[in-house]
Curated annotation (Swiss-Prot):
Keywords associated with the record: Aminotransferase, Antibiotic resistance, Lipid A biosynthesis, Lipid biosynthesis, Lipid metabolism, Lipopolysaccharide biosynthesis, Pyridoxal phosphate, Transferase
Lineage: Bacteria, Pseudomonadati, Pseudomonadota, Gammaproteobacteria, Enterobacterales
Listed name of the protein: UDP-4-amino-4-deoxy-L-arabinose--oxoglutarate aminotransferase
One term of GO molecular function: UDP-4-amino-4-deoxy-L-arabinose aminotransferase
UniProt function note: Catalyzes the conversion of UDP-4-keto-arabinose (UDP-Ara4O) to UDP-4-amino-4-deoxy-L-arabinose (UDP-L-Ara4N). The modified arabinose is attached to lipid A and is required for resistance to polymyxin and cationic antimicrobial peptides.
Pfam families named in the record: DegT_DnrJ_EryC1
């Protein structure tokens, strides 16, 4: 068997190693100047006013919800077709996740579904920019504004994603992820952008013990007077070791996403006559970042189940992923919310499969995946 082809692999090279050496030699390896540079770079990338680097997008979601005052008795609208950390954070704050269905073909929430789920207890809406495509954020934001409800964009998949000519996160509040499989990575990390000055200040405090300044600020400006806790907070700051990696990855993002697009376009062309159906791309003006390439494997049409297909591809040395198993079908949420029924989410959650997609894939790697799928489809 050929070498195993994973569904994702981070693209790291000499520039990342040099950036790490620079930080290690500097004597300041935790939150410091590289964080500040990363935050400034994301303000430039998105056009938003504030950027706050954090240790993960999950931590970013936690402190953003908390900074908005989300707590017991509140409801937060979210798709079930998302990574479970969002729902976990809502529940850990004592609020209730209100899971809504997604469009059957692009797997993102719609303004109509959001509108139908709003109650007097709704305090936030969390649309997900999915697989590298943008949600119809103008329409969703309009619903939030009409009801006075905050919108938090889950942009974990959206580094390099554009909506109507602007980078996702150019206004409002959005949360990006730098996890190992993302379009740009620093192993673990995340970043929040916002145009709300007060919210940015609260998030900065909450992500570092509830203090008004971080360790680098105190080192730079002196320790007198001693920083005080403004409100109890967490330790979600990003180390400069990670921020240095993220800065190099950001420089490579455009080129990396171009390669992702080339691979995705080959999949679209060369699998078009197979029964493996990809997600549809949004009808609104956008630039896709192709974080994931997802097919739907319907046993009735394909002659094989999704799980069986993944096993056969694994036996052929090809890795795949599942993004995501719907949250409401998992034990805790299934038992807590037994009444939730989301037909589009459930149909897709049982059939979606993420194919290998990362910038360092060779043309031969792509051919190998396509050939395997054509073989398994009988084409």
């Amino acid at each position: 068997m050929s070498d195993f082809l994973p569904f994702s692999r981070p693209s790291m090279g000499d520039a990342e190693l040099a950036a790490l050496r620079e930080v290690l030699a500097s004597g300041w390896i935790t939150t410091g100047p590289k964080n500040q540079a990363l935050e400034a770079a994301f303000c430039q990338l998105t056009g938003n006013r504030h950027a706050i680097a954090v240790s993960s997008a999950t931590g970013g979601m936690h402190v953003t919800l908390m900074a908005l005052g989300i707590g017991p008795g509140d409801e937060v609208i979210t798709p079930s077709q998302t990574w479970v950390s969002t729902l976990n954070m809502i529940c850990l704050l004592g609020a209730t996740p209100v899971m809504i269905d997604v469009d059957n073909d692009n797997l993102m929430i719609t303004p109509d579904a959001v509108e139908a789920a709003i109650t007097s207890r709704t305090k936030a809406i969390i649309p997900v920019h999915y697989a590298g495509a943008p949600a119809d954020i103008d329409a969703i934001r309009a619903v939030g504004e009409r009801h006075g409800i905050s919108v938090i964009e889950d942009a974990a998949h959206a580094a390099g994603t554009h909506y109507k000519g602007r980078h996702v996160g150019w206004q409002g509040t959005a949360i990006f992820s730098f996890h190992a499989i993302k379009n740009m990575t620093c192993a673990e990390g995340g970043l929040i952008v916002t145009d709300d000055d007060e919210l940015a200040s609260r998030i900065r405090s909450l992500k570092f013990h509830g203090l008004g300044v971080d360790a680098y600020d105190r080192q730079t400006h002196g320790r007198a007077p001693q920083a005080e806790v403004i409100t109890p907070g967490f330790k979600y700051n990003l180390a400069d070791i990670n921020a240095a990696l993220a800065l190099v990855q950001l420089e490579k993002l455009s080129h990396a996403n171009q390669r992702r697009t080339e691979i995705a376009q080959r999949y679209l062309r060369e699998l078009a006559d197979t029964p493996f159906k990809p997600l549809s791309v949004p009808t609104w003006d956008h630039q896709h970042a192709w974080h994931l390439f997802i097919i739907r494997v319907d046993e009735a049409a394909c002659g094989i189940s999704r799980d069986a297909l993944m096993e056969k591809l694994k036996a052929m040395g090809i890795g795949t992923g599942l993004h995501f198993r719907a949250a409401h079908t998992q034990k805790y949420y299934r038992e807590r919310f037994p009444e939730v029924s989301l037909p589009n989410t459930e149909w897709n959650s049982a059939r979606i499969c993420s194919l290998p997609l990362f910038p360092d894939m060779t043309d031969d790697d792509v051919t190998r995946v396509i050939s395997a799928l054509r073989q398994l489809s009988g084409r």
